[in-house]
Amino acid sequence: MEAKTDAPISPAPTTNPPAEAGKEPNASSNAQANPTAAPGAPPSGAIAVGQSTNPVAQQQQQPAVAKKPSSETNNMPTRQYLDQTVAPVLLHGMQALARERPTDPIQFLASYLLKHSNGCDENNASAAAVDNNS
């Protein structure tokens, strides 16, 4: 968290040094050496933090674009979302758990959910076929 608090602070102090750097004779050589950093920026660590925040900001913007297709699920109510996505697979997993009664029920349910999380409709059809055969 400290990196996040340092990132917004580092650009603010660098806005004042350019005015002071103009009074210094070596200000132009500093500006040419570090074009992305302010001429009077104190430590190079602050520059690295400032530069690392730009890719982080870009990465934060990119997932927002990637999440737009899933906005359909974000717009539906929580109950409806859970009923459509989680409940069917979880229900079948709980039924299998009750039938088999394994010694480690949490591990059994976790592995069941991972195995059957791809397609709930396919699982419903196969579970119905297994129940009919029994």
UniProtKB/Swiss-Prot annotation:
Residues 1-81 are annotated as: Disordered. Signal peptide: none annotated. Expressed in larval brain, gonad, imaginal disk and salivary gland and in adult brain, testis, ovary and salivary gland. Keywords: Chromatin regulator, Nucleus, Transcription, Transcription regulation. Disruption phenotype: Viable and fertile with no overt disruption of metal homeostasis. GO terms for biological process: chromatin organization; heart development. GO terms for cellular component: MLL1/2 complex; MLL3/4 complex; Set1C/COMPASS complex. Residues 71-81 have a biased composition (Polar residues). Residues 31-68 have a biased composition (Low complexity). It is found in: Nucleus. Component of the SET1 complex that specifically di- and trimethylates 'Lys-4' of histone H3 and of the MLL3/4 complex which also methylates histone H3 'Lys-4'. Inhibits MTF-1 transcription factor activity. Belongs to the dpy-30 family. Core component of several methyltransferase-containing complexes. Component of the SET1 complex, composed at least of the catalytic subunit Set1, wds/WDR5, Wdr82, Rbbp5, ash2, Cfp1/CXXC1, hcf and Dpy-30L1. Component of the MLL3/4 complex composed at least of the catalytic subunit trr, ash2, Rbbp5, Dpy-30L1, wds, hcf, ptip, Pa1, Utx, Lpt and Ncoa6. This is Protein dpy-30 homolog. It comes from Drosophila melanogaster. The gene is Dpy-30L1.
